[in-house]
Each structure stands twice: as structure tokens, then as C-alpha cells.
A protein has these predicted regions:
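A compositional/biophysical signature of low hydrophobicity enriched in polar/charged and small residues
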Residues: 1-337
């Protein structure tokens, strides 16, 4: 069935935060929109099919567990498609982009722990015959807090991300974390569907998700959109070289600027002096450049060495799967229960 564009916008925009943690969340959304539950489910199914919806699930904090690293390779132009395909085929890779730079292939490798991530990086190097930078996160200043589709800016007043104070998820929590990364099934009682896979009660699943939101393990739970499919098909990663004793101050101001979707401090690499990163998305390059100039000035970063790396090709974009290796545990939990 065809979904009215206004309804689709509401479904994708309004429940990036505050998604109903109830037995029948889609019915609650239907009441708020004055439509029927079937229209809500059909709307989300259509958005999933056309790629504008990545999933309805959670974004975990940096300290919740698992591991990830930003990787980068300098790939000869004649090998770019070949190497990009090898990188994208790795299950741990959730983002893989070509960018305008000598180091032209940028990807995120995820895994259950740092050792597994490093093993996967070494395997990629062996398969491609190319070295890869490991640019580890030191501190997140802004992670995925959602994106206002009406105004094309990052959502909500900025909440600066400090180092995680919560303990990492462990043991019996990990299968649920894996499902949260995967996303809710589009059925009337999605948490009940999860509960059957986990051997938990529906009430306990909902309560646990709420607890993780309150204690900071989850930064948000709700609709996760894909910018490109919604018309925001220009993006650039801007990197700055900032003295280590001042990077946190600049990073926090940078992260607070409208239009900045992600902001991190990362480790440097030989020949790569940059330690502060910001992502900006927009409908065209001029709009992105304008935001970059504005936020650079606002954060006091004018005069610092910087580079702007526009993306040219998106090879892969999926949700992070730091807990994906724990799917097998779901069966054992359910059987034991």
C-alpha cells in the first residue's frame, strides 16, 4: 500500500527518540498519529524496503561493550572496487566509504572485543595486501542522537558525551544487546518476539531496555534512518590537528554545533596528525561546506591544520554489530529456559 509522504516523515522523524517501550508500541504510535496500527507497520515496512529506515533499535554508548575501530587504506585507483568489495564482505564492517584523499577507503570494523577487531583487521590486510590505519576512539563528544529530517540538522540540544561511567554489558545481557543492534521485528508485539528468542518474559525485555536507557548504556532507542536515501546524499568527514591538552575543550564545543552529526577524538597515525573528527551531512556539497566553515569558526578551530574528506561512494552502511557473535547464545538461553 502507498503511504502518504507526511505520514512517512512523521514515522521516521518523530520516533528517533522516545519510542514507546510498551507491549504494543506501534499501536501507541498509531494513536498519536490518529491512524491505524496497520498503517504504521506498513509505513515502517515500506521505509525498510526503500532503504530510508535502517532499523528500529538502539545506539549503544562507547562504554557498553564490544569494540570498534576506524580503519583507513590508501588503495590504488585501479584496485578500489576490488578492495572495497573485500572490505564490505567482512561481517564486522558496518560502514565502508570511498573518500576524496590519498587514503581513500574508510571503514569501521566492529567486534565483541578489541582482540577480535584486531584479528579481523589483520585478515583484511592479508587479503588485500595493503596496510590499514587503526584510528581508535579516545573520546566520543557526540554519537548518534538522531537527525531532524525537517530541518536537516542533528536532533535535540546537544548533550556532551563524557567517558562512559557504566560497566560494560556482560553474560546474559549480550543476546538482547545483539537483538537491539539488529532491530525490532515489524509485528504488533515486537518485544514478545524478542522474548521468545531469549527465553525471557516480554515485561523483562521492555524493562531491561528502559534500564539501559536510564543508566546510559543505550544512548537512544528508536528509529535509525539512512541519510542518503532521504536526500542527504552529501557528507564530509572533517579532521583537525589539535594539541592534546586542548582537544577536549574544542571537541565539546564542536559537538554542540547544529549540523554536526558525529564528533570524536581519535588516535593519530604515522603521517596522519589529526585527532579531532566531525561528520556533517547535507543535501549538497555547498550546504556541507557552509556548515563546516561555521562550526570550525564557532569551535575556535580556525588556523588549526584540517582536511575535509567528502565521500564519493558508499559501499556499505549497516548498523553497528558489536554484539553479533552472541546470537548463538539466544538458542541456548531459550532452551535452558
Amino acid at each position: 500500500m502507498d503511504i502518504h509522504p507526511h505520514l512517512k516523515l512523521r514515522l521516521l522523524n518523530d520516533w528517533q527518540h522516545d519510542f514507546p517501550l510498551k507491549a504494543q508500541p506501534f499501536a501507541s504510535i498509531a494513536v498519536a498519529l490518529r491512524v491505524c496500527e496497520e498503517d504504521v507497520l506498513a509505513g515502517y515496512a515500506g521505509a525498510l524496503a526503500d532503504g530510508s529506515l535502517s532499523r528500529i533499535g538502539g545506539v549503544f554508548s562507547h562504554g557498553a561493550g564490544g569494540a570498534a575501530v576506524l580503519g583507513a587504506m590508501a588503495v590504488p585507483d585501479h584496485r578500489l572496487e576490488e578492495v572495497a568489495a573485500i572490505v564490505s564482505a567482512c561481517p564486522g564492517v558496518n560502514h565502508n566509504y570511498a573518500r576524496e584523499h590519498r587514503v581513500n577507503l574508510w571503514f569501521v570494523m566492529t567486534g565483541p572485543d578489541r582482540q577480535q577487531v584486531e584479528a579481523s583487521m589483520q585478515q583484511l590486510e592479508q587479503r588485500t595486501g595493503l596496510p590499514a590505519w587503526r584510528l581508535h576512539m579516545v573520546r566520543p563528544y557526540r554519537i548518534d542522537l538522531g537527525f531532524d529530517l525537517r530541518h536537516a540538522v542533528s536532533r535535540r540540544p546537544m548533550r556532551v558525551s563524557h567517558p562512559a561511567a557504566t560497566e560494560p554489558l556482560q553474560g546474559q545481557d549480550l543476546p538482547l544487546a545483539s537483538l537491539i543492534e539488529e532491530g525490532l521485528p515489524l509485528v504488533p508485539r515486537p518485544f514478545a518476539a524478542w522474548s521468545r528468542r531469549l527465553g525471557m518474559t516480554e515485561t523483562d525485555v521492555i524493562r531491561t531496555v528502559g534500564d539501559w536507557l536510564r543508566n546510559g548504556r543505550l544512548k537512544r532507542f528508536g528509529v535509525v534512518v539512512r541519510h542518503h536515501e532521504l536526500g542527504f546524499d552529501a557528507n564530509a568527514m572533517t579532521v583537525y590537528d589539535v594539541p592534546d591538552d586542548r582537544v577536549d575543550a574544542h571537541g565539546q564545543i564542536l559537538a554542540a554545533q547544529p549540523g554536526v552529526t558525529l564528533a570524536y577524538r581519535r588516535t593519530r597515525a604515522p603521517g596522519w596528525p589529526f585527532n579531532l573528527y566531525a561528520m556533517v551531512h547535507g543535501t549538497n556539497r555547498d550546504a556541507v561546506r557552509s556548515v563546516i566553515e561555521r562550526v570550525t569558526d564557532a569551535a575556535g578551530l580556525v588556523g588549526h591544520d584540517r582536511q575535509v574528506l567528502f565521500s564519493t561512494t558508499r559501499y556499505k552502511q549497516t548498523g553497528g554489530r558489536r554484539f553479533r557473535d552472541h546470537h548463538a547464545q539466544e538458542v541456548s538461553h531459550a532452551v535452558a529456559g
